[in-house]
Amino acid sequence: SIQTVFFGFLIATAVAVPLGIVSGLSPTANAAINPLVQVFKPVSPLAWLPIVTMVVSALYAGGEGGMSKSFLISAVTVTLCSLWPTLINTALGVASIDKDLVNVSRVLKLSPWKKITRLVLPSALPLIFTGLRLSLGVGWMVLIAAEMLSQNPGLGKFVWDEFQNGSSDSLARIMVAVLTIGIIGFLLDRVMYALQSLFTFSGKR
């Protein structure tokens, strides 16, 4: 489960951060991207899952040693549901940069790449990390439901199998799994918080 959620989370981060930077820097891009975010952000993972399943099934060409289809379905579903908090917070962080700093970058005639790496990212990093923490939490929650329905090996599939089993011990096993899910979710958030504190000047906000 942890492997799957990190795979989906990394893809979501790779998509959301660049889009958020573009959206934060350009009002025109924001006007185009923001409506799409508001349309797709509320969509339930249960709605995404059939679409993802059909697309992955049509394109899947895995073999021995490759990623399983159920793994890809779960990971892509995590990506689609978890990228929005990071995208929104990145755009907000970039758009909130001190205007004086922006003016200084213009006076110094910084190239777009230097402007992003030396001004935009350092200034927006606290909000970016806030988005990453939210995204990882959403991804972990979504993953459990995705594993149940896609039958990808993990905690979600374990809970579903025990529910289907219906033996006298199933309830106890499900409760242990639920506690495990909660504890892992808490630990994942603590890891992201530690990284936020390490790499930003306002990690305690």
Q: Which residue stretches match the model-derived regions?
A:
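Transmembrane alpha-helix signature in integral membrane proteins
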Residues: 1-22
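Hydrophobic alpha-helical segments of integral membrane proteins
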Residues: 1-2, 25, 29-40, 101, ...
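Generic hydrophobic transmembrane alpha-helix motif, especially the helices
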Residues: 38-85, 92-93
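Non-cytoplasmic
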Residues: 131-186
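C-terminal transmembrane helix and the adjacent membrane-cytosol boundary/short C-terminal tail
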Residues: 175-205
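Transmembrane alpha-helices
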Residues: 76, 80, 112-146, 176, ...
